[in-house]
Amino acid sequence: MGNKKIALKVENISIRFNLSKEKVDNLKELIIKKLKGQKIHFNEFWALKNINFELQKGDRLGILGLNGAGKSTLLKVIAGVYKPTTGTVKRYGHIAPMIELGAGFDPNYTGRENVFLYGSVLGFSREFLEEKYDEILEFSELGEFIDVPIKNYSSGMRARLGFSIATVVEPEILILDEVLSVGDAKFRKKCERKMQKMFDHGVTVLFVSHSLAQVKRLCNKAILLEHG
């Protein structure tokens, strides 16, 4: 099997977090305790343990699991936001991640300003975003709200804007974390139609959902996470 057909390879991924046994309200309090020589005791928490899978170009992987199962953590490892404690992730292509609703946005900026801010996070040039701006605005259906600070947006409006920016060009790998679980049903269907076009063009998708029916409709593979 040649690498040209592989989009993503996840090998023995585990990630450990340290949770404080004591209540520490903020970073300042933590530093003071350390300066005073007070020991902070931690519990180890494994968010993911020994995750393995491989995706071919064009695969659509649905990731299912209850809250706290490690779905979002897995996507953050794949996107490079978190470094795994053990294991490796091999990516073959440009990734467009939509991991947290509004991540990469500045709430005090308008929707228009955030097009350029979030677009730059995704690696798009300002010139490219100016060229694609009307297309982004049209798909988002935000209209005059594009000039309103996004701290005044509903979660559905932020999802519209984020999805419209992230999918303005087809990436090789698209990561979606429950983005299609917010907003109105009409816009979700519109997003699904755009995703279907990407599927037809061979884009690889990792898609977190609580809906088994949605995963069955959109994905050709699925994994179920239970406590990592």
Model-predicted segments: where are they?
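The feature captures the beta-strand-to-loop junction immediately N-terminal to the Walker
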Residues: L64-L66
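Pre-NBD coupling/linker segments of ABC/ABC-like ATPases
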Residues: G2-K49
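Conserved ABC ATPase "signature" C-loop
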Residues: H227-G228
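Conserved ABC ATPase "signature" region
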Residues: K28-K36, F116, F128-F145
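Conserved catalytic segment of ABC-fold P-loop ATPases
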Residues: R217-L224
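Conserved H-loop
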Residues: S211-R217
